Amino acid sequence: MNLLNDKTLRWKRCTEGDDFDYPIDYSDAILDAREDGRLEILVKWEPNCYCHFHRHTAEISSLVLEGELHVTDIDIETGKELGKRVRVAGDFVHKEPGDVHMEQGGANGALVLFNLYAPEGEGKLVESLKKDGSVISVSTMERILRKRK
C-alpha cells in the first residue's frame, strides 16, 4: 500500500461549525485496528486547519509524511501554551500517554501516520477536550473494532 496515493483508503472527514474558535477540518483513514490494542491511522489536515484540542490516553508514535504539522503544547490546568513546534516531512516522535496539545496543518496541510497502543480495558486512545480541559468525547479501540466488524 502506498500511503501517499492509495485511492482505496476510506477517509472520514471531520469539520465543525461555530462551536470552536479555530477552524477544524481534518480527515482520517484507519489502516489497521487489532484486538491487541494497536491502531494504525492516517490523518490529513487541510491547510491552516486544526483537529480537536486533545489528550492522548494511549502510547503513540507518529511520522509526518507530507506538509507541516504545527503542534502547540497546552498546560491542562491553566490552559496556557507551553510551547510550539513545527514538524516537517520525515519527523518522527514517540510519546507516552498524557500528552495534551493542539495540532494544525501548515500552509499546505499535513499528512501524518499515527501508531497508537492501548492494550487495557476498552482501549482509551484520545480524549477530545473543550478549551477548559473538560472532555467532549473519548475515542476507544473497543468502539473502532466494533464498527469494523
Label each region the model flagged:
Residues H56-T78:
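Glycine- and acidic-residue-biased ligand/ion/polar-headgroup-sensing regions
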Residues E46-N48, H70, Y117:
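Solvent-exposed residues in well-ordered beta-strands and their adjoining turns
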Residues D75-G106:
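Short acidic-glycine-tyrosine-enriched beta hairpin
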